[in-house]
């Protein structure tokens, strides 16, 4: 039973580390051209190069209420905090 709790605790630690980005890959956003045919034409002719455009979409959030000062609610903490508390609880059970 103690071995099972130890393995479960270690696996939860690894999951949390991957989700927070410590062990995961950091990725960057790449913009792609709007039209592949326009990109090919832009490479071959000078006239098409002036008409080729790239599309970039910007997502704007609608302004809402400003954030309140102070500590956030326990429901706003997310899954990583839940896994952290579960991991701590399992460690305490393992050590007892």
From Swiss-Prot:
One GO term of the biological process aspect: response to bacterium
Keyword Membrane: yes
Highest taxon listed in the record's lineage: Eukaryota
Propeptide: 71-96
Gene Ontology, cellular component aspect: plasma membrane; side of membrane; sperm midpiece
Coiled-coil intervals, chain numbering: none
Signal peptide per UniProt: 1-23
Chain residues carrying a lipid of type GPI-anchor amidated glycine: 70
Compartmental location: Cell membrane
Alphabetized UniProt keyword annotations: Cell membrane, Glycoprotein, GPI-anchor, Lipoprotein, Membrane, Signal
Protein's membrane topology: Lipid-anchor; GPI-anchor
Residues bearing glycans: 26
InterPro entries from the UniProt entry: CAMPATH-1
Pfam families on file: CD52 (PF15116)
Primary role: May play a role in carrying and orienting carbohydrate, as well as having a more specific role.
UniProt protein name: CAMPATH-1 antigen
Biological source species: Rattus norvegicus
Gene from which this protein is expressed: Cd52
């Amino acid at each position: 039973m103690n071995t099972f709790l130890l393995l479960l605790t270690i696996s939860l630690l690894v999951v949390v580390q991957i989700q927070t980005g410590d062990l995961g890959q950091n990725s960057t956003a790449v913009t792609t051209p709007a039209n592949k045919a326009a990109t090919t034409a832009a490479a071959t002719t000078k006239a098409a190069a002036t008409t080729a455009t790239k599309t970039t979409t910007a997502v704007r959030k609608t302004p809402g209420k400003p954030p309140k000062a102070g500590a956030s609610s326990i429901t706003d903490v997310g899954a990583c905090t839940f896994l952290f508390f579960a991991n701590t609880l399992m460690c305490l059970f393992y050590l007892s």
